[in-house]
Swiss-Prot record:
<feature type="binding site">
    <location>
        <begin position="142"/>
        <end position="145"/>
    </location>
    <ligand>
        <name>GTP</name>
    </ligand>
</feature>
<dbReference type="InterPro" id="IPR041095">
    <property type="entry name" value="EFG_II"/>
</dbReference>
<dbReference type="Pfam" id="PF03764">
    <property type="entry name" value="EFG_IV"/>
</dbReference>
<feature type="binding site">
    <location>
        <begin position="88"/>
        <end position="92"/>
    </location>
    <ligand>
        <name>GTP</name>
    </ligand>
</feature>
<dbReference type="InterPro" id="IPR004161">
    <property type="entry name" value="EFTu-like_2"/>
</dbReference>
<dbReference type="InterPro" id="IPR005225">
    <property type="entry name" value="Small_GTP-bd"/>
</dbReference>
<feature type="domain" description="tr-type G">
    <location>
        <begin position="8"/>
        <end position="290"/>
    </location>
</feature>
<dbReference type="Pfam" id="PF00009">
    <property type="entry name" value="GTP_EFTU"/>
</dbReference>
<dbReference type="GO" id="GO:0003746">
    <property type="term" value="F:translation elongation factor activity"/>
</dbReference>
<dbReference type="InterPro" id="IPR000640">
    <property type="entry name" value="EFG_V-like"/>
</dbReference>
<dbReference type="InterPro" id="IPR020568">
    <property type="entry name" value="Ribosomal_Su5_D2-typ_SF"/>
</dbReference>
<comment type="function">
    <text>Catalyzes the GTP-dependent ribosomal translocation step during translation elongation. During this step, the ribosome changes from the pre-translocational (PRE) to the post-translocational (POST) state as the newly formed A-site-bound peptidyl-tRNA and P-site-bound deacylated tRNA move to the P and E sites, respectively. Catalyzes the coordinated movement of the two tRNA molecules, the mRNA and conformational changes in the ribosome.</text>
</comment>
<dbReference type="InterPro" id="IPR005517">
    <property type="entry name" value="Transl_elong_EFG/EF2_IV"/>
</dbReference>
<dbReference type="GO" id="GO:0032790">
    <property type="term" value="P:ribosome disassembly"/>
</dbReference>
<keyword id="KW-0648">Protein biosynthesis</keyword>
<dbReference type="InterPro" id="IPR009000">
    <property type="entry name" value="Transl_B-barrel_sf"/>
</dbReference>
<dbReference type="GO" id="GO:0097216">
    <property type="term" value="F:guanosine tetraphosphate binding"/>
</dbReference>
Length: 699
């Protein structure tokens, strides 16, 4: 089969935003205008096509990112058919992992902001994640019909708060109830969408007289930004003072692809104004799979290789999401980077080193699916029938093995104990938790060694609430949930040199393992670093990995209070062995003994998750809010002006002090203040609190 749409006419984009910026509504409108859904789904009616889990429809938030394929020809049918793959990403901070996964496989993004609340904390998180993966993006300032909506104020915040370089290509005509339409600064015409047919048709009109001056000022900014794309354009602009429409568009595209500028548009998805213009901008300015750098990976011999977006290259794809579907079982969402694969083809999972077979391939349209026979470079689709694939695995051609860059996932910060209500629930709970953990790498399941309780940990209270809710609904498991616990960690601040000796020699086959280890802190975030400096074969090669295993096992069970130990560098530099009695087990135990002893001598400390907290409050309550944050061991980082005279307080607060904060804040401010929080880093716990934690854990 030949390719239906040339790859340069593909756009793989994500729609990202803060909770409530109107991201799902925007995606719904896109599906409506591209002809996929005949009735527009409203989020507040719980009928949006992209939000297909029951919990999403009830809570009005998007939890999993659904991938949808649509086609677009332009507002005036000025383009050939372009295939747009849209991934709708959740905006709630507990689901940052979903955003991270989506950005990893996208070529471009549309970031949606609310016209009245502007740049909010989660917007900064999404923006930083997009920076990390160098994703070219554009901005849609939505909800221009809302009270307090101000497009240029939001553009200003994007510049100052996000450090970006926004270039508006539109201006709004009117705002709040009087929002009429937008001015296209390239054509210098006003676009007026017809309300009678839900904005399907529109007319170009002259710019209102009172806005001509403002439009000309912003038009000049736009042309200047375009001229900076190259010296030739700059010379032409300086000589003639103008560029052609085609030159402007080409230049803006080039600078967007280089992440030098971010084009800004505005509208109101709910009022059906401005969304088609966003689609046009996606096609004109965001990259196709061949406009972004080739993905890098490593081959079997650890050499770096590149895979280009080309059907003739060997097949390579990244599994970026696993979802359980009520009808077909497990769906593995993949982004194909190179080559072609057909249904029934065998592929190789290079991370797990296992062969897999593509049973069926489906293209998702929100929660409807269409079976297809093949996928090609640039496609995003879901495969059915893959047995052992987890998020972040690479699927490739078994003759051309490659491991594409792995994704990094955040450490969970909050933990609760769950207990099945009955014997029947026990077995079902194990299966349910296993499936849910396979879908979501930021959710972990473990068993407490002492109490035998099942502990689940995640990115926040909402995250775990939804997991428990899904166990009940999808797997009909009833369970009792304990109080949330903070996921503390341990590390060392000093150095130590220690001996670990495990000897049992009382007749018959004995045990003999003997090691000398240096312990010191590794770089923050580096995890466990093991260095082998054994010389002269004092410990045989085959036992060295056992020493590392022993250390790692002891790290997982902690030394001070039983919490996992982070960021340690262990150097094995000496030891001895016995010809008969030495074994892998003996050296593993010796390594574990040495680590426990050494860590206790190297100034061990307990770490706690610090959260970045932003509280938005009327000025009258500012003193109370700041006083309360200080009582919670918070560090106030700064204050900003919010909309409508509200104040924004930015602070770092330990997670352990934030339980129940929502209720306390509501009662302290008569419900007028709101807050958001996200994980920032692990920091050392003050001595008095550390002592209390150790005592409570009975160490």
């Amino acid at each position: 089969m030949a390719r239906k749409t040339p790859i340069e006419r593909y756009r793989n984009i994500g729609i990202c935003a803060h909770v409530d910026a109107g991201k799902t509504t925007t995606t719904e409108r896109i599906l409506f205008y591209t002809g996929l859904s005949h009735k527009i789904g409203e989020v507040h009616d719980g009928a949006a096509t992209m939000d297909w889990m029951e919990q999403e429809q009830e809570r009005g938030i998007t939890i999993t990112s659904a991938a949808t394929t649509t086609f677009w020809r332009g507002m005036e049918a000025q383009f050939q058919d372009h295939r747009v793959n849209i991934i709708d990403t959740p905006g709630h901070v507990d689901f940052t992992i979903e955003v991270e996964r989506s950005l990893r496989v996208l070529d471009g993004a549309v970031v949606v902001f609310c016209g009245s609340s502007g740049v909010e904390p989660q917007s900064e998180t999404v923006w930083r994640q997009a920076d990390k993966y160098h994703v070219p993006r554009m901005v849609f300032v939505n909800k221009m019909d809302r009270a307090g909506a101000d497009f240029l104020r939001v553009v200003d915040q994007i510049k100052n708060r996000l450090g970006a370089n926004p270039v508006p290509i539109q201006l709004n005509v009117g705002a709040e109830e009087d929002f009429k339409g937008v001015i296209d600064l390239i054509k210098m015409k006003m676009i007026n969408w017809n309300e009678a047919d839900q904005g399907m048709t529109f007319t170009y009109e002259e710019i209102p007289a009172d806005m001509i001056e403002l439009a000309e000022e912003w038009r000049n900014n736009l042309v200047e930004a375009a001229a900076e794309a190259s010296e030739e354009l700059m010379d032409k602009y300086l000589e003639e003072g103008e560029l052609t429409e085609a030159e402007i568009k080409q230049a803006l595209r080039a600078r967007t692809l280089n992440n030098e500028i971010v084009l800004a548009t505005c509208g109101s998805a709910f009022k059906n104004k401005g969304v088609q213009a966003v689609l046009d901008a996606v096609i004109e300015y965001l990259p196709s799979p061949i406009d972004v750098p080739a993905i890098k990976g490593i081959d079997e011999n650890d050499n770096e290789v590149e895979r280009h977006a080309d059907d003739n290259e060997p097949f390579s794809a990244l599994a970026f999401k696993i979802a359980t579907d009520p009808f077909v079982g497990t769906l593995t969402f993949i982004r194909v980077y190179s080559g072609v694969v057909n249904t029934g083809d065998a592929v190789y999972n290079s991370v797990k080193q296992k062969k897999e077979r593509f049973g069926r391939i489906v293209q998702m349209h929100a929660n409807k699916r269409e079976e297809i026979k093949e996928v090609r470079a640039g496609d995003i689709a879901a495969a059915i029938g893959l047995k052992d694939v987890t998020t972040g695995d690479t699927l490739c051609n078994s003759d051309h093995k490659v491991i594409l860059e792995r994704m990094e996932f955040p450490e969970p910060v909050i933990q609760i104990a769950v207990e099945p209500r009955s014997k029947a629930d026990q077995e079902k709970m194990g299966i349910a938790l296993g499936k849910l953990a396979a879908e979501d790498p930021s959710f972990r399941v473990e068993t407490d060694a002492e109490t035998g309780q099942t502990l689940i940990s995640g990115m926040g209270e909402l995250h775990l609430d939804i997991i428990v809710d899904r166990m009940k609904r999808e797997f009909s498991v009833d369970c009792n949930v304990g109080k949330p616990q903070v996921a503390y960690r341990e590390t060392i601040r000093g150095k130590s040199e220690v001996e670990g000796k495990f000897v049992r020699q009382s007749g018959g086959r004995g045990q003999y393992g003997h090691v000398w280890i240096k312990l010191e802190p590794s770089e923050p975030g580096a995890g466990f670093v093991f260095v082998d400096e054994v010389v002269g074969g004092v410990i045989p090669k085959e036992y060295i990995s056992s020493v590392a295993k022993g250390i790692e096992e002891q790290m997982n069970s902690g030394v001070l209070a039983g919490y996992p130990v982070l960021d340690i560098k262990a150097t094995l530099f000496d030891g001895s062995y016995h010809d008969v009695d030495s074994s892998e087990m003996a050296f593993k135990i010796a390594g574990s003994m040495a680590f426990k002893k050494g860590a206790l001598e190297a100034q061990p400390v307990i770490l706690e998750p610090m959260m970045k907290v932003e509280v938005t409050t009327p000025e009258d309550w500012m003193g109370d809010v700041v006083g309360d944050l200080n009582r919670r061991r918070g560090i106030i980082e700064g204050m900003d002006e919010g909309v409508a005279g509200l104040k924004i307080i930015r602070a770092q607060v330990p997670l352990s002090e934030m339980f129940g904060y929502a209720t306390d804040l509501r009662s302290a401010t008569q419900g007028r203040a709101s807050y958001s929080m996200e994980f920032f880093e692990y920091a050392e716990v003050p001595k008095n609190i550390a002592e209390a934690i150790v005592a409570e854990r009975g160490y």
